[in-house]
Amino acid sequence: MNLLPFDEQKPLDFIAVGRLCIDLNANEIHRPMEETVTFTKYVGGSPANIAIGMARLGMKTGFIGRVADDQMGRFIVQYLKNNGIDTSHVITDKSGSVTGLAFTEIKSPTDCSILMYRDNVADLKLEPNDIHEDYIRQAKCLLISGTALAKSPSREAVFLALEYARRHGVVVFFDLDYRPYTWQSKEETAIYYNLAAEKCDVIIGTREEFDMMEQFAVHQHDDEKTAQKWFDYHAKIVVIKHGKDGSIAYTKTGETFVGTIFPANIVKTFGAGDSYAAGFIYGLMNGWPIPKAMEYGAAAASIVISSHSCSDAMPTLDQIEQFIQHIKAARPLQNHK
């Protein structure tokens, strides 16, 4: 049984909606932000990273979003174009908005934090009029992320995109991407996350993100109950990530899969979820068994957290396969030591 019936006749493989911003990653690692003086600039934002990851894997990819009318906005659009992503629905906002900035602090491989500047950002100016039914109709799948739900009019634009996707048989992925600093209250957050999740075919998030969505529910912190809740709506697959302990995928048909964990020379922890999503979605779109899709997602995540950047480090298919082969070849040698 094919859980996700992708329409192979559609010309676009993948469209992402939402956040386009700038990551400024600390060059001086192993020190606090107060002592960091230089940063390297990259394109950032979870949906942007996932779209870049999909394009690197050879998928025909498009993006729907807004960027600021400034140098940073132009940098983002050109970067997407350079990676073969269709930017015909990336709009330059003329309202005086700014590009969102994320400064990353890398104190140690496991102690990383992000300082966000999100006031009056262009990506949250996305309007329903920016969402075109004919464009979404052409895609096999659509990705939304939670940050775009944080404020109007972006919130309404996302729900319109969901409506068009459901109308035209477009498979919908929801990357939860919860960022508390963009929301006004826990009640608002839970309400809109739940309303969006009800319309999605695949939901991917951390245990903590699902806990946020379930904060008013009777049962919490139970992966199986979490998955079953969404199977009562449209969801076919729910993936719950547990950080260094790996991920678990549940299907509406009652299957459970525990994901592979790969070693990594960790530079920073952020970016793992975005690269995992790209590898996992790519596998599902190619009709792979869920465990194989999870394996490629985990391998992509290990590659990215071993790198300084997120978007620049999104791997190609060859890089993922070489990484997996290298790790599997090394394991027998380790077992004989």
From Swiss-Prot:
Keywords: ATP-binding, Kinase, Nucleotide-binding, Transferase. GO terms for biological process: inositol catabolic process. GO terms for molecular function: 5-dehydro-2-deoxygluconokinase activity; ATP binding. It comes from Geobacillus thermodenitrificans (strain NG80-2). Gene3D superfamilies: 3.40.1190.20, putative 5-dehydro-2- deoxygluconokinase. It comes from the Bacteria. It holds the Pfam family PfkB. It catalyses: 5-dehydro-2-deoxy-D-gluconate + ATP = 6-phospho-5-dehydro-2-deoxy-D-gluconate + ADP + H(+). This is 5-dehydro-2-deoxygluconokinase. The keyword Nucleotide-binding applies. Its EC number is 2.7.1.92. The lineage of its organism: Bacteria, Bacillati, Bacillota, Bacilli, Bacillales. CDD domains: KdgK. Pathway: Polyol metabolism; myo-inositol degradation into acetyl-CoA; acetyl-CoA from myo-inositol: step 5/7. Belongs to the carbohydrate kinase PfkB family.
